[in-house]
């Protein structure tokens, strides 16, 4: 794709006003762009950093057209929007990301089928439409396996681990509600991710390989650079993916590494990703900077420089009291509080980035500091 460069003062429309939209807006504004955001939550984080706010549901056609008419380019911060609605908008307005990636990736089945056709390394899977299909999954995959809903899952929602026959009932109940995909369970050594930006004329910029740890299915911390020898292999897998799926802007591919050190593609997020937040302080360009450069038609940096090894930690609602007590003593903690109105114990409320000469020591220090968040 080739498209015109936006000039200073042009307007970027963002569908979605969560923390990703907020950080996109902040990158856009420092480059001289104006921002309009559309979100159904009148207190969304992005509202208070945007030049204009449209309070509307994501399926409100009139509001989406208002956003498009008042924007020089439109982007989105998450994938759970209607691909049909997005397809209509791409015919009327400038949306470099397009609708194809959303159409493929918001459905776990089409995502896996596309990855399989692209010859990437993925775990064996079975389409689940009926309870009978679950029995076929047992035959093909064996125990244990994971049942995931085809649509709408994030942060571990819509997933069930089935270890034996006695745990099938919960899976049956899930399948009765909606179609699913069953995946073979992997004995995981490590989870990693690779954040990538594709720009005008297929320029491609890679961020360093990121090592991730989840707790209760929510990203807990990210260490960069990843303590793994799989970066080149991960890049090769991403190259296969980008030949199969149209991308413009920043996206992230998540991988599993098993105990035999084999790399598997897990899933793709077609927008900036939680594991890339460290890049705001730790890199010469953040994942949001490169996203804005891409969708506005600007040239991307040839390479991303990691300024220092880094540990990034998500901050949940239950972490904020401790953080408020400790923050003033630690000027080296780069704190981002997203501005969500309702504080819940397991809700992502912000993140914290620490640049360090010793990630292992820093990692252990933070685990001790955040009581109850260690393994």
From Swiss-Prot:
Keyword Nucleotide-binding in annotation: yes
Domain ATP-grasp: 112-296
Gene Ontology molecular function terms on file: 5-(carboxyamino)imidazole ribonucleotide synthase activity; ATP binding; metal ion binding; phosphoribosylaminoimidazole carboxylase activity
Pfam short name (any one): PurK_C
Gene3D superfamilies the UniProt entry points to: 3.40.50.20, ATP-grasp fold, A domain, ATP-grasp fold, B domain
Catalytic activity line of the entry: 5-amino-1-(5-phospho-beta-D-ribosyl)imidazole + hydrogencarbonate + ATP = 5-carboxyamino-1-(5-phospho-D-ribosyl)imidazole + ADP + phosphate + 2 H(+)
Cellular component terms per the entry's GO annotation: cytosol
Keywords: ATP-binding, Ligase, Nucleotide-binding, Purine biosynthesis
Assembly and oligomerization: Homodimer.
Record organism: Staphylococcus epidermidis (strain ATCC 35984 / DSM 28319 / BCRC 17069 / CCUG 31568 / BM 3577 / RP62A)
Protein EC: 6.3.4.18
Any one GO biological process: 'de novo' IMP biosynthetic process
Keyword Transmembrane helix tagged: no
Associated pathway: Purine metabolism; IMP biosynthesis via de novo pathway; 5-amino-1-(5-phospho-D-ribosyl)imidazole-4-carboxylate from 5-amino-1-(5-phospho-D-ribosyl)imidazole (N5-CAIR route): step 1/2
Name of the molecule in the record: N5-carboxyaminoimidazole ribonucleotide synthase
Record-listed ATP binding positions: 108, 148, 153-159, 183-186, 191, 214, 266-267
Highest taxon, organism lineage: Bacteria
Enzyme class of the recorded protein, top EC level: ligase
């Amino acid at each position: 794709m080739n498209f015109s460069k936006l000039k200073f003062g042009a307007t970027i429309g963002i569908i979605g006003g969560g923390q990703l939209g907020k950080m996109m807006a902040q990158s856009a504004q420092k480059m001289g762009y104006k921002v309009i955001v559309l979100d159904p939550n009148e207190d969304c984080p992005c509202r208070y950093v945007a030049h204009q706010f449209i309070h509307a549901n994501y399926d409100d056609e009139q509001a989406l057209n208002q956003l498009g008419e008042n924007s020089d380019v439109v982007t989105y911060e998450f994938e759970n929007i209607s691909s049909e609605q997005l397809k209509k908008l791409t015919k009327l307005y400038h949306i470099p990301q397009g609708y194809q990636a959303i159409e493929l990736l918001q459905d776990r089945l089409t995502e896996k089928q596309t990855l399989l056709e692209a010859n990437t390394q993925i775990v064996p899977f079975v389409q689940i439409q009926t309870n009978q299909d679950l029995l076929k999954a047992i035959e093909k995959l064996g125990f244990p396996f994971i049942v995931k809903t085809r649509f709408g899952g994030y942060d571990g929602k819509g997933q069930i681990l089935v270890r034996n026959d006695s745990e099938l009932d919960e899976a049956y109940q899930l399948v009765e509600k909606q179609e699913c995909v069953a995946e073979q369970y992997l004995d995981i050594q490590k989870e990693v991710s690779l954040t990538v930006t594709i720009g005008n004329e297929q320029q491609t910029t890679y961020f360093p390989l990121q090592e991730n740890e989840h707790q209760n299915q929510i990203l807990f911390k990210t260490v960069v650079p990843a303590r793994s020898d799989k970066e080149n292999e991960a890049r090769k897998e991403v190259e296969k993916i980008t030949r199969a799926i149209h991308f413009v802007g920043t996206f992230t591919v998540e991988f599993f590494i098993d105990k035999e050190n084999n790399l598997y593609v897990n899933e793709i997020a077609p927008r900036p990703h939680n594991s890339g937040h460290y890049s705001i302080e730790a890199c010469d360009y953040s994942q949001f900077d490169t996203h804005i450069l891409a969708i506005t038609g600007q040239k991307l940096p040839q390479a991303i420089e990691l300024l220092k090894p880094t540990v990034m930690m998500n901050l949940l609602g239950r972490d904020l009291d401790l953080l408020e007590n400790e923050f003033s003593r630690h000027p080296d903690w780069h704190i981002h509080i997203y501005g969500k109105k309702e504080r819940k114990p397991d809700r992502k409320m912000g993140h914290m980035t620490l640049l360090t000469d010793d990630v292992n020591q820093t990692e252990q220090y933070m685990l001790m500091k955040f009581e109850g968040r260690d393994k």
